[in-house]
Each structure stands twice: as C-alpha cells, then as structure tokens.
C-alpha cells in the first residue's frame, strides 16, 4: 500500500521525468560533490606525478676559489666550542689552548688532525667519569652556498664515538631554523659507512621526489620533528667511511650547495677528477652524485643559510648512545671491558670513561678544505 502511494505521488525512482524539484536538487548536489572530489583527486595525482618527474636542471656554474683552509694555519680559521654539548654527549669539548696542550689538534704543512683524548682513564686525575676530552670547531666564516671540497685522509671511528663533518649555523639556540647539512657522519665502529643527511624545519621533504644518486635513500622527511629527528638521509655503503675508507687512503668529499639542490660526491684518493686537481672544479662533469637533495619539495635557499663548517668527535650522545646496544661494541662488564661503578653492561658512557686506549683510531685527518663560489 505504501509503495503504491509513493509511486502515485512521486513516480518510480527509475523515471527521472517523475521526480520532484526537491529530488532534482538533491541529485544535482550529489553529482556536483562527486565531480568536485574527482577533480580534487586528479589535481593531487597530477601534482604528485609532476613532483615525481620534476628535476632541477643543475646547469653548469663557473666557480672561483674563495677560501682555503690548509697547512699549519688550518685551525686558525676555526673557533673552538667550549660549552655544554647540545647533543648530550659524554664529552668535554676543550678550548684551543687545552686542545693544543693535550695534542688534540695540530697541523703540519700537509695535514691537520683533530682527535679524542687517549690519556685519561679510570686511575687518572682527573678521570673521565663525567666525560672524555674531545674537540669541536666551527669555521669563523659562514656560507650561504658554494662548492666545498674536503680532503679527508682519515675518518674517526671506535665504540662510543659519534664524529661528524657538517654545515650548520653556529648559533645552537636557533637550530634547525637555518638548516643542517651532514656531509660525513657515523657512530661507533662505523661499519655501515657514511651517512649524508639534511635536517630542517617544516616543508622540506625528499619523499616521492626524483633523485639521481648512487646512494640509498633512508627517511624522506627532513623536518626535525619527524622520525626522531632522523632527517632525510642517504646511506652510501661501508667503504665510504671507517676502516675501509682509511686503508684505501681516504679521499675527497665534494658538496655542491645551490638553490637547485644539494649534491654530494665522494672520490677516492686515486680517482680525484682532473678538474679538481687543476683548481677548476666542474660538478657537471663528475657523473651521478652519491647523494642528491633537489629543491623539488624543499626551498633550499630558504631552509639553508648562514652555515659554518663544523668538525667534531662527540662521544655517546643522543645518536651514539641509542645505537650502541645494537652495535658490535663490547656489552659485558666481565670479559669485554672493565666496568667501574656497577653501570649497565650496555652503557656507552661507561665504556668511554674507562677504555682510553680504544680511542687511538678516533681522529680526523684532513689535507685541505677549499670553498668555491660563483663569481
């Protein structure tokens, strides 16, 4: 009875000619909503596809040498950091005079060395119960772009170490407002090789972005609040840092930082491009980069400014401490190493405090740093 009434008053639903004005309005509104959704999805897909296929031109630039850090005056170009470690390391960063007296930094005509102290142990006075002596330096000059050539002869490694060569604003209070570019970084025995990473504020990502590089992309979001501040990193393989890299004679890390993107190459000491040797570096001839961070979804010029060159060897800290339990470093107080004070057998700080001889390989050795910029 009810169905017949509906058909008499409204007509069957499958006959639009019998629909009332109210039904027509509802149908048109529904169709409009569906069309809007389809269009929005198409726009998003188109944008994502465009981003996935977009790539900066990286047109050839003419670079001129602006700064050279080398020889016995190498460390004259740097300020020594002598404050509490922002990365919560088990370390005492010493001033220049102390670094010199402890032989933690020194330079000759051919190389410059920055290392961790190996003299202080559990029976020393003072001991290393609150942290081991080390060094962190930052260049007196800041940069906003350029082509950086770092001749690295030896990379530091060892249980409890967290060394890095990086670019960042020396004002720690505003980090990461001006970005961070990690060029060489590893922890503990560095058996996974070098990690190259960007850290930024929001709106900078490498996810779903075309990249031309030989390294392996890790996390894609560069924002410091995501992935426990892992940043957007590129893994480059075991031979790019640590024992293999050092035994092969080291090499040169090249970093091109420009608005189009940030690219990094690593050249072994016996395979340096001729244009670098000749003093006329041309990244357009170097082939595929080891790491590539294009500007597709990251405004490089806005996110990265006012950066000093930083060299340091942290100990434990937020990253080294976190990675220590899963490393192949000693874990047991009995047998593997001496524990003092009954600390946890997986405690990175206990190992660092009580095993000074194990830091003999924890040193950077550089030939020179050369910074080129466009004329």
Give residue ranges: language-model regions.
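Glycine-aromatic-enriched beta-strand/loop faces of beta-sandwich-type recognition domains
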Residues: 176-245, 314-321, 334, 343-350
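Short, structured patches in soluble enzyme cores that scaffold and shape functional sites
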Residues: 154, 185, 200-202, 256, ...
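Localized edge beta-strand/strand-to-loop motifs within extracellular or lumenal beta-rich domains
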Residues: 247-263, 267-270
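Short, glycine/acidic-rich beta->alpha junctions
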Residues: 142, 157, 173, 236-237, ...
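Low-complexity, Ser/Thr/Pro/Gly-rich disordered linker/stalk regions
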Residues: 16-35, 41-189, 269-270, 277-289, ...
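Conserved His + Asp/Glu catalytic blocks
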Residues: 293
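Intrinsically disordered, low-complexity terminal tails of fungal membrane proteins
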Residues: 1-23
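Generic recognition of flexible, low-complexity loop/linker segments
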Residues: 240-243, 250-253, 297-299, 355-357
């Amino acid at each position: 009875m009810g169905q017949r009434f509906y058909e008499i008053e409204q007509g069957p639903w499958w006959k639009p000619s019998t629909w009332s004005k109210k039904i027509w309005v509802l149908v048109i509104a529904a169709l409009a909503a569906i069309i809007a959704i389809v269009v929005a999805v198409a726009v998003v897909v188109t944008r994502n596809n465009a981003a996935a296929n977009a790539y900066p031109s990286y047109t050839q630039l003419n670079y001129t040498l602006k700064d050279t850090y080398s020889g016995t005056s190498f460390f004259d170009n740097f300020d020594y950091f002598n404050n509490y470690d922002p990365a919560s390391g088990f370390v005492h960063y010493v001033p220049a005079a102390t670094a010199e007296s402890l032989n933690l930094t020194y330079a000759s005509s051919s190389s410059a060395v920055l290392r961790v102290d190996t003299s202080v142990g559990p029976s020393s006075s003072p001991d290393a119960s609150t942290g081991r002596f080390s060094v962190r330096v930052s260049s007196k000059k800041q940069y906003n772009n350029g082509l950086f050539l770092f001749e690295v002869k030896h990379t530091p490694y060892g249980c409890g170490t967290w060394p890095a060569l990086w670019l960042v604003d020396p004002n720690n209070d505003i980090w990461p407002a001006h970005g961070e570019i990690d060029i060489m970084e590893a922890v503990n025995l560095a058996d996974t090789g070098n990690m190259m990473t960007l850290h930024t504020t929001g709106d900078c990502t490498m996810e779903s972005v075309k990249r031309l590089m030989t390294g392996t992309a890790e996390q894609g979001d560069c924002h410091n609040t995501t992935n426990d501040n892992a940043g957007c990193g590129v893994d480059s393989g075991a031979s790019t840092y640590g024992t293999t890299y050092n035994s092969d004679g080291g090499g040169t890390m090249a970093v091109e930082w420009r608005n189009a993107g940030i690219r990094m190459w690593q050249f072994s000491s016996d395979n340096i491009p001729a244009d670098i040797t000749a003093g006329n570096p041309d990244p357009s001839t170097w082939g595929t980069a080891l790491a590539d961070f294009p500007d597709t979804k990251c405004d490089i010029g806005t996110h990265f400014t006012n950066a000093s060159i930083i060299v340091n060897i942290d100990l434990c800290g937020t990253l080294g401490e976190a990675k220590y339990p899963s490393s192949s470093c000693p874990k047991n107080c009995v047998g593997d190493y001496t524990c003092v004070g009954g600390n946890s057998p997986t405690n990175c700080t206990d190992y660092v405090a009580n095993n000074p001889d194990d830091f003999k390989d924890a040193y950077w050795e550089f030939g020179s740093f050369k910074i080129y910029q466009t004329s």
